[in-house]
Amino acid sequence: MKTTSEIRQSFLDFFHSKGHTVVPSSSLVPENDPTLLFTNAGMNQFKDVFLGLEKRPYTRATTAQRCVRAGGKHNDLENVGYTARHHTFFEMMGNFSFGDYFKHDAIQFGWEYLTSPQWLGLPKEKLYVTVYETDDEAYDIWNKIVGVPTDHIIRIGDNKGAPYASDNFWAMGDTGPCGPCTEIFYDHGETFWGGLPGSPEEDGDRYIEVWNIVFMQFNRLADGTMEKLPKPSVDTGMGLERMTAVMQHVNSNYETDIFQTLIKEVAGLLNVTDLDNKSLRVVADHIRACSYLIADGVVPSNEGRGYVLRRIIRRAVRHGNLLGAKEAFFYKLVPTLATVMGHAGEVLTQKQAHIQKTLKAEEEQFARTLERGLALLEDALTKVENNTLSGEVAFKLYDTYGFPLDLTADVCREREITIDEAGFEAEMTAQRERAKASSNFGADYNNVIKVEGQTDFIGYDNLAAQATIVGLFSNGKAVDTIQSGESAVIILDQTPFYAEMGGQVGDSGLISTEICNFAVNDTQKYGQVFGHIGQLTSGSLSIGDKVTATVDATRRVAITANHSATHLLHSALREVLGDHVAQKGSLVSENILRFDFSQPEAISKSQLEEIERIVNRKIRENIQVTIETMDIESAKKKGAMALFGEKYGDVVRVVGMTEFSIELCGGTHVQRTGDIGLFKLVSEGAVAAGIRRVEAVTAETAIEWLHNQQKVLQQSAEFLKADSNSLVEKIQQLQDKAKRTEKELQQLKDKLAAQAGSELVKQANKINGVNVVVQKLENVEVKSLRTMVDDLKNQLESAIVVFGTVADEKVNLIVGVTKDLSSKVNAGELVGAMAQQVGGKGGGRADMAMAGGSEPQNLDNALKFAEEWIQAKL
C-alpha cells in the first residue's frame, strides 16, 4: 500500500519523465496577488504565466502545492471534522502546459498515470470521466484514443444558471482566460450511496472526483464574446488526500496514513480511547494548516490572514478542551507532523521551534478566556428562543472573549441550535461605524485622488501658511466646488499639515478664507499629495481659491511630545531587554503612544520600571534634539535605526538625541527632551507570538493619568474604610473572608443537593426493571441541574433521569441516561420531543441533553409525556 509521501513523489516523478520541470510549492501567502487571501490552487503561482504577463524558462511544470481554504470565498472551516473530505489544508498535485501540449497529451498523461501498473494502477472500469457538453474534441479523445467506453463518459452542460456556468467550464474571472474542463471520478462501489456526476445523487460518497484538467483555450471579453487564445494552456489538479484514500482503500481522508498518525498522536497526548471522535479529526486537520501558515510567515492577529490563523488555532484548542485537554497540547503535534509529511515536511522541521513557540503562546493566551467564554455560551444556550442564539451574544463572545463566530457555531451545531448571523453582522457593522465615526469621512479615496505635481510640506517650522487649492474630492469623486455642510478632501499646493506617516497620526486644524471655514479632522497622503479630510462648515470653496491653512497647535505639540518619547522608549527597550528588540509597528497620537516590538516573552514589572526610569531620566537631562539630512549610507554608518514598514530614498532625515537614540524619521519632534515633561507606561502585553506592545502617555496627559490613579486610590480607601497606605492589606483581608464565605456556601449547596439527590433516589420508579426519575424541581439553578443529573446517574448506576424547572417564565429541561441504556433511550431525542411540548427546541448527546421552552404552563404535560415515551422505548 502506497503512503501519501510515495504517491506525492510518484506524481512528480511521472510528469518529470514527461518533460515537466518540478517546481517547488509556493508560499501559502500569495505573492503580488491582493485578490487572494491564501494560495488555494496549484495554478496560483502561475497566474501571470497564463495571463501572458510573465515568461518562465520552461513550458511544462509539475508541482505539489500546499493550499489553504479557510476564510474568504473558499471557506471549508465549519465542515472540517464532520465530513470525510473537507480540510483547511490540503495538497494539490498539478501538471501545467504553458502553450505547449494540449488536450491529447493532457488526457493521455492523466490516464496513463492513474491506470498504468507502473504508476497507480487503478482499475479502468472504476473510472468515469466528464466533459463539457459541447467539447466533442475531449469526448472523442477519451472514447476513440484512450478507449473509455461511452457509458463511462458523461457530458455536463451549463448547470449553474448562465451560459458557460458549469461544473465542467472554468474561468479565472468574469473576463479573461477560460475554457472547458474534463474530470475523472473514482467509483468506490455499491456499498456507498451516491449517483454519477450530473445525477440528482451526485453529492453522495460513491463517485469521487480525483482528477481535473482545465483546457484554457478562450479569452472571454466584457461583452461575453469568446476569443480563441493563440497558445492554449493546460492546468491539471489532483487532490493528494483524496487520491491517497483511493489508493489505501478507505472512504474517508481521515483514515489515510497521515491523518491516522496525527489522530493517534492527539489521542495519546490527551488519553482519548475513542479514535472515531470528531474532535480528533478537527485537531489533526488544523495542526497542518496552522503549522504551514506560520512556517510561511503568518502571525496570529485580529485581521486578515492572521485572524484566519487565529480562528483555526482557537477552534483546535476548543476541540482539545472537549477531548479533556487541561494544558497546552496543540504545539506538541508539530514534530510528528513534520515527520509524517515526508519531503513536504522539511519546511516545518526548519522552522519547528518558531512554529511551536507561536502555537503555544496563542493557545495559552486563548485558554485564559476560553473557560469564561464557554460558561457564558452555556448559560446563553439554556435561554435561547426559537432554537436560535442571538447575534448580540455571539458578538459579545467574539468581542470580549475572542470567540470567532465559527467556534461559537461549532458549539451550537452540537446542540442543533442556529446562530442569528444577520444580528451578528449588524453588531459588527455598528462597531465598525463607531470606529470610523470620529473621521466623519468614510469614502476610500486611495484610488480616486489623481492630482498632478506634489504638495510641499512646510510644517516642520510652520503651523500656518497661505496655500492654493489644487484639488477637491467629495462623495468619492473629483469636484470643482464644495458647499457648506459637505465632507471633502482638499489638496493644497503646500501645507503645514503633517500627513499620517511612520505611525504618527495626521494633523487637524482649519483651512479658511475670510468667509469660509473647512474643519480638518485628519490629513492623509495620497501618492505625492496631502489630502486634508474634513467638512466645510460655512461658505463654499473651489479649485484655485487662496486659503489659510492653520494646524491645531495644541494637538500638534502633544503629538510631537509623544513621537520624541517613542524614540526614547525604543532605545530604553533595547537597553533593558536586548538588541533583539525591533520595532514592528507604532501609533503616535495626541493622547497616547503605542509601540509594538519583537520580544519572545513577557516583560517583568522590574524591567518595565527600569524602562520608565530611563526614559524619564533622559527627559530630565533636557537633551537637544538634532535633525540632519544625509544620504542613506552615512545614516547607516552613524548607527541610525530604521522604522518598521517605512521605505527610504537615497537622502534621509536623521533624528538624534545624543548617542542614546538615532533614528531615521520623517515625523515632528520636540526641540529638547525636557519638552516632553513626563513619561508614564500605562500598559504592556502580547499582540501576537513574539510581539509585545507597550502604551504610554506623556506631558499633561501623564499628569492627568496620575491624578486619576490617585483619585481611584483615595476613593477605594474611603469605600473600604481604610487608610490608603494600608489598602492592600485591607483588600487581602476581604478576599480571605470572601473565600471562606464562598467555601461555606458551596458546602451548604453540596449538602442540600446531596439531600435532594437521596430523596430523588428513593422516588425512582421501575419501568421494565430500569430506574427512572422524572421530576419537576423547584428553586434549582439551571447550572445545578447537570450536577444533580450526574449525581443521580452515579448513585443509581443504571438509570434515566429527567428534570424540568421554571425560572423567569422559561422552561429548562435536562435528560441524563447512563451509558448502558443510551442505545435504547437517546437523551437528545427525548429532550427534543419534550421541548416541543413546551414551545421550544433542544438536543444534545445520547447520554446528556438540555432544552428550553417558553410555555411553563405545559411543563407537567411534558414530564408526563417523558414517562410515556420512556416506557414505550423500554
Curated annotation (Swiss-Prot):
Domain notes: Consists of three domains; the N-terminal catalytic domain, the editing domain and the C-terminal C-Ala domain. The editing domain removes incorrectly charged amino acids, while the C-Ala domain, along with tRNA(Ala), serves as a bridge to cooperatively bring together the editing and aminoacylation centers thus stimulating deacylation of misacylated tRNAs.
Organism whose genome encodes this protein: Actinobacillus pleuropneumoniae serotype 7 (strain AP76)
Signal peptide annotation: none
Cofactor remark from the record: Binds 1 zinc ion per subunit.
Family annotation (NCBIfam families): alaS
Superkingdom of the source species: Bacteria
One Pfam family recorded for the sequence: DHHA1
Keyword entries, A-Z: Aminoacyl-tRNA synthetase, ATP-binding, Cytoplasm, Ligase, Metal-binding, Nucleotide-binding, Protein biosynthesis, RNA-binding, tRNA-binding, Zinc
Disulfide bond sites: none
E.C. number: 6.1.1.7
Gene Ontology CC: cytosol
GO molecular function: alanine-tRNA ligase activity; aminoacyl-tRNA deacylase activity; ATP binding; tRNA binding; zinc ion binding
GN (gene name): alaS
One of the GO biological process terms: negative regulation of DNA-templated transcription
Biological function: Catalyzes the attachment of alanine to tRNA(Ala) in a two-step reaction: alanine is first activated by ATP to form Ala-AMP and then transferred to the acceptor end of tRNA(Ala). Also edits incorrectly charged Ser-tRNA(Ala) and Gly-tRNA(Ala) via its editing domain.
Subcellular location: Cytoplasm
InterPro entries: aa-tRNA-synth_II/BPL/LPL (IPR045864), Ala-tRNA-lgiase_IIc (IPR002318), Ala-tRNA-ligase_IIc_anticod-bd (IPR018162), Ala-tRNA-synth_IIc_core (IPR018165), Ala-tRNA-synth_IIc_N (IPR018164), Ala-tRNA_ligase (IPR050058), Ala_tRNA_ligase_euk/bac (IPR023033), DHHA1_dom (IPR003156)
Protein name: Alanine--tRNA ligase
Family: Belongs to the class-II aminoacyl-tRNA synthetase family.
Catalysed reactions, semicolon-separated: tRNA(Ala) + L-alanine + ATP = L-alanyl-tRNA(Ala) + AMP + diphosphate
Cofactor requirements of the protein: Zn(2+)
Binding site for Zn(2+): 563, 567, 665, 669
